[in-house]
Amino acid sequence: MHDWDPALYQRFESEHTRPAVELLARVSHPAPRHIVDLGCGNGNSTQLLLERFPQSQLIGLDNSEAMLASARKRLPGVPFVQADIADWAPTVAPDLIFANASLQWVAGHAGLFARLMRCLAPGGVLAVQMPDNLDQPSHQLMRELASQSAWRDQLAHAADQRAALLSVEAYYDLLAPMACRVDIWHTAYRHVMPSVQAIVEWLESTGLKPFLDPLPAVLRDAYLQAYTQRIGEAYTKRADGHRLFAFPRLFIVAQRAP
């Protein structure tokens, strides 16, 4: 994929940040010394961590240089590092690994989650939030359009960028043998959106990227036009003219055994 667009992402920063706030609220570690914001993006979640734990040694990690530039501008006193979560290893065992809306882009969750738990210091916490929306109309329509003849050749592998999440039970079974506490919950947000275009713009900054980036301009515009029409049919107007955009998310907080 092409690099992320911080300006587009920031148009919906309050909606993107809300799950991070709710995830952090369930982290009970009293005083983590070393914290890693894994997949920190533009630093919105890093800022929450800094405000909650101002005495901690905090580092933000992401693979997008554009997002990291935005994060450094937001929090010039925090070190931000460009790295890939898939092969990242800490130099010091963290007391808290915070991964808000990042691990869904990394393959092989069985191995990934076990590795992250092993990276933690004894008693450390792994806090994860992941979109669980591949079966929502927003993402079903991406795949349906990608299978049509106009875009099939260019988008043959677009859907491979993200695999479906494991079941809640599978995540629990992965984490429980290494943890003294596992907290898992699922939330389906209903974001009140002013228009169809607002929904599409939100998705352009996230889930649509693997489907738009491979396309030349003419095909990209045609895909977006067809997608926007179908989104309007899937997310109909409510009584006040707004549209409810359903967005399920999975939350996990696991504390490594001391």
Swiss-Prot record:
Keyword Methyltransferase: yes
Lineage: Bacteria, Pseudomonadati, Pseudomonadota, Betaproteobacteria, Burkholderiales
InterPro entries: Methyltransf_25 (IPR041698), SAM-dependent_MTases_sf (IPR029063), Trans-aconitate_MeTrfase (IPR023506), Trans_acon_MeTrfase_C (IPR023149)
Similarity field: Belongs to the methyltransferase superfamily. Tam family.
Enzyme Commission numbers on file: 2.1.1.144
Protein name in UniProt: Trans-aconitate 2-methyltransferase
Catalytic activity: trans-aconitate + S-adenosyl-L-methionine = (E)-3-(methoxycarbonyl)pent-2-enedioate + S-adenosyl-L-homocysteine
Molecular-function GO terms, alphabetical: trans-aconitate 2-methyltransferase activity
GO cellular component: cytoplasm
Places the protein is found: Cytoplasm
Stated role: Catalyzes the S-adenosylmethionine monomethyl esterification of trans-aconitate.
Keywords, ordered alphabetically: Cytoplasm, Methyltransferase, S-adenosyl-L-methionine, Transferase
Short name of one Pfam family: Methyltransf_25
GO BP of this protein: methylation
Record SUPFAM superfamilies: S-adenosyl-L-methionine-dependent methyltransferases
Main location group: cytoplasm
